[in-house]
Amino acid sequence: MKKISLWALALLTALSAQAQTFEPELADPKPGAQETWNSVKKASLAWGSTDIRYSRSQPATGQKTLLLDAWRGERVSAQAVLSTPVDLARVTFEVSDLRNGKAIIPASRINKYFVRYVMTDWHENKSDSFLLPDHLSPETEMKVEARTTRPLWLDIRVPQDAKPGTYKGTLTVNCDGQAFTLPLSLQVCSRVLPEPSEWAFHLDLWQNPYAVARYFNVPLWSKAHFDHMRPIMKLLADAGEKVITCSIIQHPWNSQTYDPFESMIAKMKQIDGSWKYDYTVFDRWVQFMMDCGIDKQIDCYTLVPWHYVFDYYDCATNSTKTVKCEPKQAEYRELILPFLKDFAAHLKAKGWFTRTCIAMDERPMDQLQAAWDLVKEADSQYRIEGAMNYKVGDTGLIDEMHDISILYYDAHVPREYMDARRAKGQKTTFYTCCAPDRPNTFTFSDPAESAFLGWHAYTLGFD
């Protein structure tokens, strides 16, 4: 599968504030030596580092002051750590307005999260599981158990019109009536970062709406489902996401994810042998994502699934039928060509055709070429996107793709090649999946690895 879904990223696991019932955290399988708590006589609060994953079972140390730097329009994060030798029944925290003379960055522009712990592991059968802080939780209060550490996360959104200078404020944490405070300083320079919708960086983190429905136990595509997805997808838009992930067949990756991707387009074979297609779910999903601010590209997976199995509803028998066929076979053509023609007409009617890509990933080149030939037969103006575990130059098909994403290991592409593609309006990116071990965006990955991936793409000249 091409890319780690967005749910693995701490930034995007900040769940809807509407959900105030949280699953209990698991016990720490590796708590470490508890003697480290013997010298801790009372609760303490300090500024930590956003680059450190603090153990829940060990006391944390940090600084009493913090100075952050930001452009106008930038988002910056901070992490504080609360360690306590005794049970704290009720912990809450607030951040004041940040003031620079008469200029103010209001507290409403600072999102606050308790950081919850999740179980992770390095590799199946290669190491034991361990606990890491990863889930940014919007809950307003929390019980903190004795001899534990609880990180607190701040997401500061600097206005684009903020006056340059040093802003100062205070973080206040209330623990059973006792207040702990830390000063916070933010240095804002004169440079301005554009709105995320204007960023050129082509970020494509796959979305899985089915995971959200399962997590919150709500019906697929219900109002409750969209209500839970909205704050998550707006966070994704704020990160600069450009692409909407759509599954146009059932289980395009052979159900390899915990929450399988279902088809957003229903395909129905009529009694007379003709075809009808229901785009209701597809249309609602795409429009919803556009309303959240993600509207540059629509990637539709896939015409070359990992299991080569396609399904449709057969009106003659009132049952769902499955067909196993590959792009070179006649059955594939009979099934896919009518759909592609109808899909193109639908996309054009919606005004979405020129931003839509038929997307394929990591399949044998002969199968990709056969599918691509059929796509062009259906409509020569279709665009194709591919996640390719091939080196550039292995095939001429790559040169035809509107958007190619190359496996991280093969991401040393001649800059002049990417410049030539860019001049034609084409995109060239690289991707991570279950590889490499690092840098990546697993729950166990160091936080700096995600930042490095962006800098690495820029340095190599990718889009």
Predicted regions and their residues:
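Aromatic- and acid-rich polysaccharide-binding/catalytic face
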Residues: 385-411
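Aromatic-lined carbohydrate-binding surfaces of glycoside hydrolases
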Residues: 157, 168-175, 180-381, 389-398
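Short, glycine/acidic-rich beta->alpha junctions
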Residues: 72, 227-228, 277-281, 366-367, ...
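Positively charged n-region of N-terminal signal peptides that target proteins for export
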Residues: 1-4
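Mature N-terminal, pre-catalytic/accessory segment of carbohydrate-active enzymes
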Residues: 17-254, 353
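Catalytic-core region of carbohydrate-active enzymes that cleave or remodel glycosidic bonds
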Residues: 406-463
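Bacterial N-terminal signal peptides
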Residues: 7-16
